[in-house]
Curated annotation (Swiss-Prot):
This is Acetyl-coenzyme A carboxylase carboxyl transferase subunit beta. Belongs to the AccD/PCCB family. The keyword Glycosyltransferase does not apply. It comes from Bacillus cereus (strain ATCC 10987 / NRS 248). It is an enzyme of class 2 (transferase). It catalyses: N(6)-carboxybiotinyl-L-lysyl-[protein] + acetyl-CoA = N(6)-biotinyl-L-lysyl-[protein] + malonyl-CoA. One of its GO terms (molecular function) is acetyl-CoA carboxylase activity. It is found in: Cytoplasm. SUPFAM superfamilies: ClpP/crotonase (SSF52096). Acetyl-CoA carboxylase is a heterohexamer composed of biotin carboxyl carrier protein (AccB), biotin carboxylase (AccC) and two subunits each of ACCase subunit alpha (AccA) and ACCase subunit beta (AccD). Gene3D superfamilies: 2-enoyl-CoA Hydratase, Chain A, domain 1. It holds the Pfam family Zn_ribbon_ACC. A zinc finger (C4-type) spans 32-54.
Length: 289
C-alpha cells in the first residue's frame, strides 16, 4: 500500500556471512583488549605491539623483546637445552610441558643469554608468559641464577624482563626454593658492584614479584603492568576493605615509591642505554674480588 512507503523501517545490523569471515585469514587482524579497536596485526607489530589507539601494551614473546632492546645479531643464548622434569610426579604436568614446548617453540618460560645495547655488553633474561604463564619452576630459577653468575664472571650488568604468574605449583617446594637461589645469586653480583636492572611487564606476580623482580638497582615497569604478590580479591577479603581501582598497577607502585620509573615500550631501549652509559666506568663498575 502507498501508506507503507512512509512507515519508518527498522534498521538491522549486517551480519557478515560465514564465507566473508573465512576470507580473512587468521592472524591478519588483532583486537585490543582495552579499547576494543581492531587493527592490522602487521601495524601492531610495527608499533612494538603497542595499541595505536589507546597505548595498551600487548604481551611480547621472548624473541620480540630481545629484538626490541638488543643490537641486531648480538644475542647469544645460554642453557637452551635445559628442560623441566616431573620430580613430584604431578598428574598431567609432563603433557602440559610438552604442549607448551610445541606451542611456543621454547623449552622453558625464560630465555637467557648475552648481547649488546649500543655496543655495551649485558647479560639478559626474558620471561615468556606463553609457557606455563611464565611460572617459575626449578629450570627457570636455575637458568636465571646461571645468567646472574655469568654476568658476575663477565663483570657486566644483568637485565631481566619479568612476566609471570608466580611459582609453579606442580613443582612444590622445588619451585619456592628458586626465590632464595636467584636472590642469593643477585646478592653476590651486587656485592661485587654489579648492576642489576629489573623491568616488570604485565603480569609480574606471586613468588617472582616477591624475589628477583623487586631486587633491581633500578626497578622499571611498562605502563599498566599488573604487579603484586597475592590477588586483589584475596587481599580485599583479608583486610576487609575496598582497594583503589589502580591498585597493583605499575602507576600505583610508582606513586608509592616501589618503582623508579614507568617506561613506555618505545623508550625502553633508550632508557636502558642511558642507565648503562651512566654506570660505564662509574662506582658500580668497580668490581671487587
Amino acid at each position: 500500500m502507498l501508506r507503507d512507503l512512509f512507515v519508518k523501517k527498522k534498521k538491522y545490523a549486517a551480519i557478515p556471512s560465514e564465507q566473508v569471515r573465512k576470507d580473512v585469514p587468521d592472524g591478519v587482524m588483532t583486537k585490543c583488549p582495552k579499547c576494543k579497536k581492531i587493527m592490522y596485526t602487521k601495524e601492531l607489530l610495527k608499533n612494538l605491539k603497542v595499541c595505536v589507539n589507546c597505548g595498551y601494551h600487548h604481551p611480547m614473546n621472548a624473541w620480540e623483546r630481545l629484538d626490541s632492546i638488543l643490537d641486531e645479531g648480538s644475542f647469544r643464548e645460554y642453557d637452551k637445552e635445559m628442560v623441566s622434569l616431573n620430580p613430584l610426579e604431578f598428574p598431567g604436568y609432563e603433557e602440559k610441558l610438552e604442549s607448551d614446548r610445541k606451542k611456543t617453540e621454547l623449552n622453558e618460560a625464560v630465555v637467557t643469554g648475552e648481547g649488546t645495547i649500543d655496543d655495551m655488553l649485558v647479560v639478559v633474561a626474558v620471561m615468556d608468559s606463553r609457557f606455563r604463564m611464565g611460572s617459575m619452576g626449578s629450570v627457570v630459577g636455575e637458568k636465571i641464577a646461571r645468567a646472574v653468575e655469568k654476568a658476575y664472571d663477565l663483570q657486566v650488568p644483568f637485565i631481566i624482563f619479568t612476566a609471570s604468574g608466580g611459582a609453579r605449583m606442580q613443582e612444590g617446594i622445588l619451585s619456592l626454593m628458586q626465590m632464595a637461589k636467584t636472590s642469593v645469586a643477585l646478592k653476590k653480583h651486587s656485592n661485587a658492584g654489579g648492576l642489576f636492572i629489573s623491568v616488570m611487564t604485565h603480569p609480574t606476580t606471586g613468588g617472582v614479584s616477591a624475589s628477583f623482580a623487586s631486587l633491581g638497582d633500578y626497578n622499571l615497569a611498562e605502563p599498566g603492568a599488573l604487579i603484586g604478590f597475592a590477588g586483589r580479591r584475596v587481599i580485599e577479603q583479608t583486610v576487609r576493605e575496598k582497594l583503589p581501582e589502580d591498585f597493583q598497577t605499575a602507576e600505583f607502585l610508582l606513586e608509592h615509591g616501589q618503582l623508579d620509573a614507568v617506561v613506555h615500550r618505545d623508550d625502553m631501549r633508550e632508557s636502558l642505554r642511558k642507565i648503562l652509559e651512566v654506570h660505564q666506568g662509574g662506582e658500580m663498575a668497580v668490581w671487587q674480588s
